[in-house]
Amino acid sequence: MTDKLWGGRFTEKAAHWVDAFGASIGFDQQMAQEDLEGSLAHVKMLGKTGIIPQADADTITAGLQHLQKELAAGKLHFTVENEDIHLNMEALLTAEIGPVAGKLHTARSRNDQVATDLHLWLKHRLPTIKEALTNLQTVLVGQAKVHAATIMPGYTHMQHAQPITYGHYLLAYFEMFQRDWERFDFTQKHTDILPLGAAALAGTTFPIDRTLVAQELGFDQIYHNSLDAVSDRDFALEFLSNSAILMQHLSRMAEELILWSTYEFNYIELGDDFSTGSSIMPQKKNPDFAELIRGKTGRVYGALMGLLTTMKAIPLAYNKDMQEDKEPIFDAYNTILGSLHIFTGMLSDLTVHEKRMAEATTHDFSNATELADYLATKGVPFRQAHAIVGELVLKGIKTNTALQEMPLSELQAAAPQIQQDVYAELTSKAAVDRRTSLGGTAVSNVLKEVARDEEMIASH
């Protein structure tokens, strides 16, 4: 027999370096509070059902509550020899109250215990992610309201396409982040399921009351299959998938802000708090924090792919491979929360160069679709109108003349249907204002969407 809590079967003590390789206490101690919460609920159930004497349950409860206070004060010390947070807590409890601590593990396995800890850990933190998303959405809506009529180029293939408003652009990301919010909300439901009571994999012979434990821990549901309860990491994969999609959205917007802050674009300027300088070039103002968010996206993608790969060939039920589920979750959580906070501050603090944005739409031929649509309203088939305007654009590029600068006679030579009223249609403002179809960039639409989105935020 060795000195491990599970050591009855073993005769040889493992070398310290072997223990260190197998230990998870270096990272799963982040679940210390959740481990104590789960144990308190479990021992309450053991006492109430008579599985252990109530006096023993009371002693264990007092010991666990003392450990909670010690944890809050930063006084608990964990060891590699006890390998994980569960055995460390049991060892600390035994040191506190003696052998009666061994009764706590009645009708429980580390398999359902660790699953419960991880469920609780995410259950406690998902609301924080949703709140951070809501804060970012609030900034987006506020800025969209201010810039509902701020005209800028819209792009496809990174080429000027049609004029839009900066407010319309911001609300596109609002929609993406709303879907992120809804995904995390849905994952919260899948996280709100209690595994405890499944024991190692097959349930237990003791007359446990899983409903009581669920009520104590605030779980809405209970796993109905003990094998599934200890094997399931779908909720963790959902969280990482949601996190990866969220970081993709942040990264796409970060990329645009980085480009737009360059000398060549000069659409925006990031605030000093979210920029850095160069150690050699005095003029530099680098968008480091936007770049960091773009870079950290790969880190979260890696967390998702890592856990997907870990889980892809694991037979039921628990296997030691599943110890690798926690670090990617902990890291992804910290990464997305930090990124959301930085991004919210960065958007609040940036300066929009409205004049420069508007100027960028004046000689870029992004009003070509307006002229084609104009001809279509005059009875010219759209495909023919498209060809006519394409030829005018080519001519304008060669002569450095915008469509709205071409004489009426020149336009009429290409299409006799064109009249003087065409010039009113060719301004960027007109192009924006005419896009009143549902979801379009018209200022009136943007303001309606702002009102709708404000209501959506209030419903969070």
From Swiss-Prot:
Identify the metabolic or biological route this protein is part of. Answer: Amino-acid biosynthesis; L-arginine biosynthesis; L-arginine from L-ornithine and carbamoyl phosphate: step 3/3
Read off the Gene3D superfamilies from this record.
Fumarase/aspartase (C-terminal domain), Fumarase/aspartase (Central domain), Fumarase/aspartase (N-terminal domain)
Classification via Pfam families: ASL_C2, Lyase_1
What EC numbers are recorded for this enzyme? 4.3.2.1
What are this entry's molecular-function GO terms?
A: argininosuccinate lyase activity
Its BP terms in the Gene Ontology are:
arginine biosynthetic process via ornithine; L-arginine biosynthetic process
Q: What class of enzyme is it?
A: lyase
Name the family the entry cites.
Belongs to the lyase 1 family. Argininosuccinate lyase subfamily.
Q: Under what name is this protein listed?
A: Argininosuccinate lyase
Organism name = Lacticaseibacillus paracasei (strain ATCC 334 / BCRC 17002 / CCUG 31169 / CIP 107868 / KCTC 3260 / NRRL B-441)
The organism's lineage? Answer: Bacteria, Bacillati, Bacillota, Bacilli, Lactobacillales
